[in-house]
Regions:
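N-terminal active-site beta-alpha-beta segment that forms phosphate/nucleotide-binding
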Residues: 1-84
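Conserved phosphate- and dinucleotide-binding cores of soluble alpha/beta proteins
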Residues: 3-10, 58-219
Length: 219
């Protein structure tokens, strides 16, 4: 069941209109991105557009395939634009992503793209990051204790291994790493937070997107 489906559908229809012939488009995850992909597939059929898509997860790659759309990779092409959802967006367009767990590949495709659209309904707009959602990090399995110790010292926060629904143990990423979630208790500058995360040994990536020139599209 998709929450706020009407608002998300409206955003999806708007973003699909940006597609032009022979473009390469990066596809993020989340329900709004999925609805946008469906709208893009309709546009491909209706207007006969030749589009190539770069997926950020196996799940999205499966959807692209089911819709009969063409796929490529970052090794073969550079995205003209990228679209994705977000869990939180602050007033300076810093964002937290990653409830789906694909944020490392999402950040790769985001950084590779010329134009970046973040599609959210108004419930995702916050005064400061961490207000509603924890910050997800991807951690090398052997480094869980080391990362926990470092973040307790640097942030005063204890990350928790994200439990996997339906099976024992934690969520494993497509890279074979563990996802941990950090509850951000105090208001902290996103650039400073990014620096702390990047300087923590054992973390391979985070759902904090800061310093990107993004265009936020909301209902």
């Amino acid at each position: 069941e998709i929450s706020n489906k009407e608002a998300k559908q409206k955003i999806a229809g708007q973003v699909a209109q940006y597609a032009k012939h022979n473009q390469v488009i990066g596809v993020g995850s989340g329900t709004t991105a999925f609805l946008t992909l469906i709208e893009l597939s309709k546009k491909v059929k209706k207007d006969g557009l030749n589009l190539f898509f770069i997926a950020t997860s196996h799940e999205i790659a499966g959807y692209i395939n089911q819709l009969g759309l063409k796929q490529t990779t970052l090794l073969n092409a550079k995205p003209d634009w990228y679209f994705d959802g977000a869990d939180e967006v602050d007033p300076n367009n810093n964002i937290i992503k990653g409830r789906g767990g694909a944020f490392v590949r999402e950040k790769l495709v985001c950084a590779s793209s010329d134009i970046r659209y973040i599609l959210v309904d108004k419930s995702k707009l916050v005064d400061h990051l961490g207000q509603k959602m924890p910050l997800p990090i991807e951690v090398i399995p052997e480094a869980v204790n080391l990362v926990t110790d470092q973040l307790q010292n640097s942030l005063g926060a204890t990350p928790n291994i994200r439990p996997a629904g339906g099976k024992d143990g934690g969520v494993i990423t497509e890279q074979g790493n563990i996802i941990m979630d950090i509850a951000i208790k105090t208001v902290i500058d996103p650039k400073e937070l990014n620096s702390i995360i990047n300087n923590t040994v054992g973390i391979t990536g985070s759902g904090l997107f800061t310093g990107f020139d993004i265009k936020v599209i909301t209902d």
